[in-house]
């Protein structure tokens, strides 16, 4: 498999990056979920090697399902649709195309020495309307 075409040079110390898996273990167009310091992250690899990391939590429902979302595009923008209610999100920015009420949290991701690394800075909030406590990651 080819080297990813997208990575982030995020601020922070090297300890801010968490190794998730070997890059070669990811399948293009098939989302994978990872738990990083209590935060569920969805990894999405495109056939051209572009790699994205977003919250695995559906902003509309609070369910942890985005790794099973539908990968697509809107013009030149790569998208991920919720498998539940089909809200469509920009994988780069997290913007929701179908409702301004929602946004999908995105994370810096890179591949270093063949290992996928994600930078998660946890921000939590209470979401009682979703039955979710402080483990909810704000978008």
Where are these regions (language model features)?
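Axial heme c-ligation environment in periplasmic c-type cytochrome domains
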Residues: 97-100
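Short cysteine clusters
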Residues: 58, 82-85
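N-terminal pre-ligand scaffold of iron-sulfur
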Residues: 1-77, 90-91, 103-139
